[in-house]
């Protein structure tokens, strides 16, 4: 179970990488940022969570 502080920190990282992927400096950087936020999604899914509209929610 994630604490509220952990959720806020992860959401912040996720949203930062997602935003950077939308306006990358180069194509390689876009791939880098996409990889980062997809990795966060994968780890959250393993822990029983998912991201919806930039917010972490528990899987049912």
Q: Which role does the model predict for each range below?
A:
Residues 1-11, 15:
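Short, charge/polar-rich alpha-helical segments
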Residues 16-23, 27-60:
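Short, charge-rich amphipathic interface segments used for partner binding and complex assembly
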